[in-house]
């Protein structure tokens, strides 16, 4: 094999049969394997929907919006890419059909096409190829994930563009990986390959012959069945891999490595690389599977609890907090709208309470009840973005005695707008891409819990909001005991709050976007630690039943 040069090689990941097979995790895991072989890896996600970005889409439809340092609102798969590799995502790492068409139409309006009829081929496909090359950024390998399912009409321009790329860059500089489903039919008692055969047939009709197949299955696919898939799909038998269901997503790179996927990619790319070093991944998986400090229950009080993908980065950041404390974090999703009905029993069953970000008035009173419960019962509390604002409103009403206190987002007539619209947001009418987005500095106050957790005076965190704490009320809150432990040094905006005497922390930013399994975010590590301490303290206390036992003669 030749030693790798500076020319970028491209791996295109497509999916077939059904959606939600795990293309993003597969792409991220491949990135982790290649990076651990000493290669520089970058990622690109191509989404076929017409929205310019996912920023205005419902979490129920799209899942989480992942925010990058440069303020891009992107697909949640970019979170997987950042968590699994050292690559830093920016707005150039996620393109949608809407954004591609927007670029082309703007060029047409500027007259850059010199009077030509602008068409899908070549103009749209050329634009797609241009953003693919731009995303590479000089990396050894660019992994391009094409969203959607092969056969969807929306994906066709992207598939045509990646078909052309192999001819543009050369055979050994472009590899096609196709993720399919090999289901086990319980009634027949066997795995079925027909869905995979049909999916590959559809891909080949478009003009793309996959170089390797990742076959998602809940069990190992035997060698003879892999040979059958290879025969009918015109793929080398050594290029058919089981993408096995595993208990933890952090086991996926190890599972694919055991299948020999990274060796095959090195062969297909004809690229030199060292032997993979996966000890860190093995350690992480061991900590996830065999925590020495047992299990801790974290209650997430939100309104998107039916779809856990809505809080993807948050969920993983809590897992990372568990890794940092050698504990397993069990998430209990608590519907805030149900709390409004008066049943708070779910809050009794958790060791800590977290109120995440969100938008809109629905469920906010339930979140405020969750905050009140945590404050009054000394249960560790962590409020993120809207969660901080809920904590402020709860304290204003129940400690400061400011009746009717609220956020201007929910009540424009509130007598006490303790949460107000940011100055820079006044007059903004467009919804897409207009919030306070991206990384901003936060100066931490000496002697606070926030300063102790971070171990730094100044940090940078990612934001996604329009509303902020109203500094007109700051003196009243400080007099009541609230500590403003983090402030934006440029604008004086409140970034962090806390209450002394308990683990009660709120932040206006989204720390979950910066957490990784190998580098758990300090706020999540500290939160899980506090939850463990609360759990242990509760277990040491005698139960109510024991307290009621009659005292004996020797008592």
Swiss-Prot record:
Keywords of this entry: ATP-binding, Glutamine amidotransferase, Ligase, Magnesium, Metal-binding, Nucleotide-binding, Pyrimidine biosynthesis
EC code(s) of this entry: 6.3.4.2
Residues covered by region (Amidoligase domain): 1-271
Biological role: Catalyzes the ATP-dependent amination of UTP to CTP with either L-glutamine or ammonia as the source of nitrogen. Regulates intracellular CTP levels through interactions with the four ribonucleotide triphosphates.
Descriptive protein name: CTP synthase
Cellular-component GO terms for this entry: cytosol
More details: CTPSs have evolved a hybrid strategy for distinguishing between UTP and CTP. The overlapping regions of the product feedback inhibitory and substrate sites recognize a common feature in both compounds, the triphosphate moiety. To differentiate isosteric substrate and product pyrimidine rings, an additional pocket far from the expected kinase/ligase catalytic site, specifically recognizes the cytosine and ribose portions of the product inhibitor.
Superkingdom of source: Bacteria
Regulation: Allosterically activated by GTP, when glutamine is the substrate; GTP has no effect on the reaction when ammonia is the substrate. The allosteric effector GTP functions by stabilizing the protein conformation that binds the tetrahedral intermediate(s) formed during glutamine hydrolysis. Inhibited by the product CTP, via allosteric rather than competitive inhibition.
Chain positions recorded as Mg(2+) binding sites: 77, 145
Residue sites binding CTP per the record: 19, 152-154, 192-197, 228
Subunit (UniProt): Homotetramer.
Reactions the enzyme catalyzes: UTP + L-glutamine + ATP + H2O = CTP + L-glutamate + ADP + phosphate + 2 H(+); L-glutamine + H2O = L-glutamate + NH4(+); UTP + NH4(+) + ATP = CTP + ADP + phosphate + 2 H(+)
GO biological process: 'de novo' CTP biosynthetic process; pyrimidine nucleobase biosynthetic process
Region of interest (Disordered), residue spans: 536-555
Similarity section: Belongs to the CTP synthase family.
Active site: 385 (nucleophile), 510, 512
Gene for this chain: pyrG
Family matches, as InterPro entries: Class_I_gatase-like (IPR029062), CTP_synthase (IPR004468), CTP_synthase_N (IPR017456), GATASE (IPR017926), GATase1_CTP_Synthase (IPR033828), P-loop_NTPase (IPR027417)
Organism in which the protein naturally occurs: Anaeromyxobacter dehalogenans (strain 2CP-C)
